[in-house]
Amino acid sequence: MSAKISIFQALVFLFYRFILRRYRNSKPKYQNGPSSLLQSDLSRHTLIFNVEGALLKSDSLFPYFMLVAFEAGGVIRSFLLFILYPLISLMSHEMGVKVMVMVSFFGIKKEGFRAGRAVLPKYFLEDVGLEMFEVLKRGGKKIGVSDDLPQVMIEGFLRDYLEIDVVVGREMKVVGGYYLGIMEDKTKHDLVFDELVRKERLNTGRVIGITSFNTSLHRYLFSQFCQEIYFVKKSDKRSWQTLPRSQYPKPLIFHDGRLAIKPTLMNTLVLFMWGPFAAAAAAARLFVSLCIPYSLSIPILAFSGCRLTVTNDYVSSQKQKPSQRKGCLFVCNHRTLLDPLYVAFALRKKNIKTVTYSLSRVSEILAPIKTVRLTRDRVSDGQAMEKLLTEGDLVVCPEGTTCREPYLLRFSPLFTEVSDVIVPVAVTVHVTFFYGTTASGLKALDPLFFLLDPYPTYTIQFLDPVSGATCQDPDGKLKFEVANNVQSDIGKALDFECTSLTRKDKYLILAGNNGVVKKN
């Protein structure tokens, strides 16, 4: 009898183990696409997604490595990556990625590498699929995983702008503070991912994986620990819409880098073909702007590709008004270093002056109009601006630094105390290849990069004059009200959003410093 009982108990035990194993290792439900998740409540689920396979619309990683090569390594390194790409395309996917990593990162100083947070987020955000983003928004905890992109390239974009909780990318090997251009072993990367997924399964018990049909990224680990796996096909990506700027979880206000165009293979080819012509065009434009009178230089510059559009012509509207003893104060938003110069072009005046907070010595020497460096002392700076106004017209950019995106930084109120009449000037700039601004690069090259662009375009709009705050202001509030009103007027004219961010905020985000340029 005892033998029968023991056999019966053994059978029950084996059956129990079989059922338990089936429960623990039950095969997940495989789905063709994540769109069905939009109808589900995912607030208690952990979503694990493949960055390049399921989040980004483009399948090519070349543009992102080209951005690293150009912005962190320079023109020669980026050209080397470009000429090697035909060979890279013949390699296996994994080997091709290794070569691009080597060319882009070898010898780059780890401490000075800021492209991952200052340059790449703009281009990654422009490549995010709206449909996939809508799914991620519904999830509880979100984990982004990449088998091809280094951690330093994707972490800033995913954490800072898409609010992804955990980012698992490939770590880079570093020796003596410099990148070797080699990623850590894939096995170590898989172990990190394995431990992470196991932990999430134990904590929540609800894990959903989203990856691509065209990659084997952690397919075994996905199938072991995810209750559901959704596969994204290339055809799905082609039908995706791009994530609109208005839906960014965090607005992209600041970004750095010289390239204004996404360096796809064809765009990079055009960029390097334009190079020899760009040097000649920049030299000619610089000569014309410095040496030829405005009446002749403006049409010549327009013929060379530099465009200037002026609306609400201030010169024509002031012809019938009596002259003033003091010059006119023009207050404009700051887009590039050449803002005061283009305002002078629009006014058809060459004796106009401007003040700067921090300008390289080379730029001061090359400037065709007089520039005066401010000391950041309110009293002495105010006196300097009043003196300049007695000599003629003055252009100021109270933001203190440039901003590329449709936002206005806080306006310093100092300009409101030096003139009774203030003319707000709304400025917009469009470039094709190169930005004429930088936060972490050589600021002396800012005008050069602007002139290297094929069709740099300025639009100047003179707004209605406003009264300053030179009268008695005992509580000190009027100057801030005037500054905010001028900022608001320019923002409305340009359809830009006004912010309270400052120069210091920008440089801390992009360059890790306070934005003061040392005299060279």
From Swiss-Prot:
Belongs to the GPAT/DAPAT family. It is found in: Membrane. The HXXXXD motif is essential for acyltransferase activity and may constitute the binding site for the phosphate moiety of the glycerol-3-phosphate. Pathway: Phospholipid metabolism; CDP-diacylglycerol biosynthesis; CDP-diacylglycerol from sn-glycerol 3-phosphate: step 1/3. The keyword ATP-binding does not apply. The gene is GPAT3. One of its GO terms (molecular function) is glycerol-3-phosphate 2-O-acyltransferase activity. This is Probable glycerol-3-phosphate acyltransferase 3. It catalyses: sn-glycerol 3-phosphate + an acyl-CoA = a 1-acyl-sn-glycero-3-phosphate + CoA. Keywords: Acyltransferase, Lipid biosynthesis, Lipid metabolism, Membrane, Phospholipid biosynthesis, Phospholipid metabolism, Transferase, Transmembrane, Transmembrane helix.
